[in-house]
């Protein structure tokens, strides 16, 4: 929204700053951060009053959780998404269709997650929105987003590039309408599975957002994309501003989510943020890099799949508990140890993902 101020730069030169993505990304970080800081306490207070018992805690998990997490309100994603949305509206170029596609997925997945959280809190059960119904809604939202990107994007939108491989691109054609939604749905649910400990999911989300913000900026710049030999996606650089808003809102939320957490983001936040990351990856044509940068989320998801398949086929469990962060808790790691070590893994994977830009 504030980009229009650049038109008056002829009268006041400093207004020219609003043309620059880097400046607006910084503004988006600061705005989202202070929004969550300012409104966070009141949102937490309101949710605590309305939810009463808060999010139900798994009885089969670490016993310490029943003592330290019981009564903690959920739906903290409302704080994150509100700050992210307001900041994006202020600092992003609202004529950019990629911005609206990403916001569509974020709000759509946020609504699905909110409904899931609502059912869990009101019924005090872990059985919220039915699995099939939830996946169908997620796929529908993602499909609309991919159709929009296919219609409004560049001819490269249906292509699939491989990291560290120069010039090898596969045109997916109409299969893009299956692959794209799969990436978005998988990303949303992977982050959702990771959100099981205080601060565990939000920091890797911010790391991934920062990484994809850098990639989006490079992909949206004709000179940089040509130098790095990656597909140029006009307008994709604007997603760096959205990524900045994610970082700012995430930092604000972490202030309240740091152990012991005052609030959980719930499916409202984790599903929306995961879907947002997946959509950005699809938009900037770095879906395969998402598997690297979001490797921690992939690991959490894989641990659940392996656990379920193993138990159904053999009656035995591979892990003491899934997702895998609970496995390490059962091995004796303290919650802060699991969280910080997983943050380190996420940071290293982000560096590996960025390095693929140069390995061509």
UniProtKB/Swiss-Prot annotation:
Swiss-Prot/TrEMBL cofactor(s): Mg(2+)
Enzyme class: transferase
Keyword Chloroplast set for record: no
Pfam families the UniProt entry points to: Glycos_transf_4, MraY_sig1
TM helices/strands, residue ranges: 27-47, 72-92, 94-114, 135-155, 167-187, 199-219, 236-256, 263-283, 289-309, 337-357
Keyword terms, alphabetized: Cell cycle, Cell division, Cell inner membrane, Cell membrane, Cell shape, Cell wall biogenesis/degradation, Magnesium, Membrane, Metal-binding, Peptidoglycan synthesis, Transferase, Transmembrane, Transmembrane helix
Pathway: Cell wall biogenesis; peptidoglycan biosynthesis
Molecular-function GO terms, alphabetical: metal ion binding; phospho-N-acetylmuramoyl-pentapeptide-transferase activity; UDP-N-acetylmuramoyl-L-alanyl-D-glutamyl-meso-2,6-diaminopimelyl-D-alanyl-D-alanine:undecaprenyl-phosphate transferase activity
Topology class, membrane: Multi-pass membrane protein
InterPro entries attached to this UniProt entry: Glycosyl_transferase_4 (IPR000715), PNAcMuramoyl-5peptid_Trfase (IPR003524), PNAcMuramoyl-5peptid_Trfase_CS (IPR018480)
Family classification: Belongs to the glycosyltransferase 4 family. MraY subfamily.
Name this polypeptide is given: Phospho-N-acetylmuramoyl-pentapeptide-transferase
Species assigned in the record: Beijerinckia indica subsp. indica (strain ATCC 9039 / DSM 1715 / NCIMB 8712)
Organism placement in taxonomy: Bacteria, Pseudomonadati, Pseudomonadota, Alphaproteobacteria, Hyphomicrobiales
